[in-house]
Amino acid sequence: MNSLLPAASGLDPIEAIATNRDDAVLAVITGVEGPSYRAVGAAMAIWADGSRLGALSSGCIEADLALHAAQVLATGKPKTLRYGRGSPFIDIQLPCGGGLDILLLPRPDRRVFLELTKRRAARQLCAIGIDIYSGALTLLDDGTTGLIGSKFVVQFAPKVRFLVFGKGPEACTFSALVQSIGYPNLLLSPDKETLEIGAASGCDVQHLRQPEFPADLITDQWTAIVLFFHDHEWEPPILFGALGGPAFYVGAQGSARARDVRLLELEAMGVARDDLARLHGPVGLIRSARDPATLSVSVLAEVLDIATSVPFTGADRSGWD
């Protein structure tokens, strides 16, 4: 096993520990004082041979964490460390000037982690409780990330899932971008070449045979739907179905004029005004993006900005992704 497992491995600390029988330590941030590189609830995995997955700082403390991980594997007892402000480790400084409390949990119960992995794969909101003294794990249906008495709770909301409808470079580039970062996604297109390019980028693809939102396509409150069509007559039937579901983001590429025409058509189809108000367009934080790459980054930034601010259950994605 390499000393530092790449993020591209596709595993997060929970899944990695659950599926690897080697002795491991879970390191999780239980408290933050001042600025911090990672949020409360962020975690990394450290194995007995020094291998690790994830990071809790910008490289300041990970090597030291590996040393302490070896110690807790030897004792079998959890341990909480303080780094930065107020830390006894005066030779290790955090450039941000803040402080971190980190719990080291030796040999976490793999059975609990396996069940947690299954729930997350099924896109279920869930949480896990960790007794900071005994290391006992409790699987919860939900919970707020933070320390409650002697139990530290981490909530896990599903990752944002992207449903990308469209044809051409914009749809291909955006799908490849979200795929490269590790977000679940599905590219739906009437165009064979678009689907081939998307599949070559590792995206899941589906042939869109007619302008409609597929009846068997399931969405949830962590779903983002984005349309990249130059042929705008495909949009209204798809948007009609998209706006009828719980997706937190629905947007379509196009100018302000195209947006106005789109809204009139949807209104004529009977879409309620409250649902029309949910439709984003022109999409993206950068106005008048002129190339597929800039547009893709712009749209992704807008979606993730909304994902971290909308008041739906589980918007705080402080779990171990």
What label would you give each PLM region?
Residues 205-206, 225, 250, 286:
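Short, well-ordered beta-strand core segments
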